[in-house]
C-alpha cells in the first residue's frame, strides 16, 4: 500500500526514518554462486565461459562466434530506423559535450623551497562495459558508459553483452558503433565480468569495469573490485519529486512512474506542501497505470515502495531530501535554484517543471549512471574521472633537499624507520 506521510503528525519522524532505512536491494544470497563462477573462469578460462554461455543464453560461442563481426555490426546498423539512429547520434553528441567539460587538467608548481611538484592525469589503458542483453534495448546505457570512456582517452574499450539465442539488439550495437567501442563480445553474466577483470585466452583483461546488470553482475563487480576498478554497485532506481501547488498532476504522475516501471523494487516519492496536489497526483498515477504497458512492474513498485510526503512548507524539503539522498531529484517549483542551493545529497538534480528526469536518462548530457541506496551521501555519478587516474610527482634539487630534508630525517627517526632517515641523510652529507 502507498505510504502517505504528513510532517504535521506526531509520528512523522519515526515513520520517515523507517522510509529512509527501508532496504530495497536484493537480499538473495548470490555471493556463493558468483564466487564459484569467478573461480571457474579463473581456472578454465574460455572453456568455462563457453559452457556458461550455452547454459544461460543457449548460445554456442564456438559455432555462433565470440565477437560480433563487421558484417553483423553493419547489418544491425542498417536495420535501424533513421529516427532512432538520429536520436542516438544526438544523445551521443550531447553526452560527449558535457563530459569533455569534465576533463581534469594536469598541473605543476614550484614552492618556496624550490621543490617542483605536480599531478598528471592519464586515462586507463583499457575499460570494459557490461550491457544487459536480450530484446530490451539499453542503448542509452551504452552511450552513457562508453562516451565518457573515450572522452577520457581510453584506447581499448570492450563491450560484453548477453546474447540469448544468439540475439543482440540492433540499437545496442548501433550505440556501440557511435560510441567508438573497439570490441563487442557475445557473453554476459558474472562470467563476463570475470573475463574482463581476469582475462582469458581470447579476452585480454581491462583496468576498469562499468555498466549496469542484475544481482549476479553487481556481485561479480563487488567481488572483483581491487583486481579491477569498477564504477559502482548500483541498486534499484529511485526518484524524489519536490513540487509546489502550481504543477500539473499528470506530469508528476508520469515522472513518478518513469522510475516505478524500471523494477518492482524501484522507489518514487512525492514531496509537496499542497495536499490537493498530492491527492490529484495519486489519482493520476492510478489512471496512467491502467494504460501503461509496464503496469505490472510499475504498480508493484508504486504500491510497495511509493510514498507521498505532505509538508507545511517546501523549506522542509531539502532536509528530507538530504536524508533520502536519492538517485534522482526533481525540483518542480517556481524557483528551483533557491531550493537546490540547500540540497547537498542527490545523484542528479532536475531543475524546473520542464526538466523531467527522463530527459536526463537520454539526451540531457550529464551521466545517468548514478549512486542509489543513499550512496549519494558520499559518491557521485559516472564521469570521465572513473576512467582516469592521477599520478603525483616531485623533483628536488640539491638546494631544495637541503631545505626540507632535515625535517624528513626528524620524522623518520620519530617513527623508528632508520633506513628512511639514512636515505635522506646520505644525500644531505654529500
From Swiss-Prot:
Binding site for Zn(2+): 259, 262, 361, 420
Lineage: Bacteria, Pseudomonadati, Pseudomonadota, Alphaproteobacteria, Sphingomonadales
Gene3D superfamilies hit by this protein: 1.20.5.1300, Nitrogenase molybdenum iron protein domain
Binding residues for substrate: 237, 259, 262, 328, 361, 415, 420
Active site, UniProt feature: 327 (proton acceptor), 328 (proton acceptor)
Keywords linked to the UniProt accession: Amino-acid biosynthesis, Histidine biosynthesis, Metal-binding, NAD, Oxidoreductase, Zinc
Required cofactor names: Zn(2+)
Known EC number: 1.1.1.23
One Gene Ontology CC term in the entry: cytosol
UniProt gene name: hisD
Name of the protein described by the UniProt record: Histidinol dehydrogenase
Free-text cofactor note: Binds 1 zinc ion per subunit.
Associated pathway: Amino-acid biosynthesis; L-histidine biosynthesis; L-histidine from 5-phospho-alpha-D-ribose 1-diphosphate: step 9/9
Transmembrane segments: none
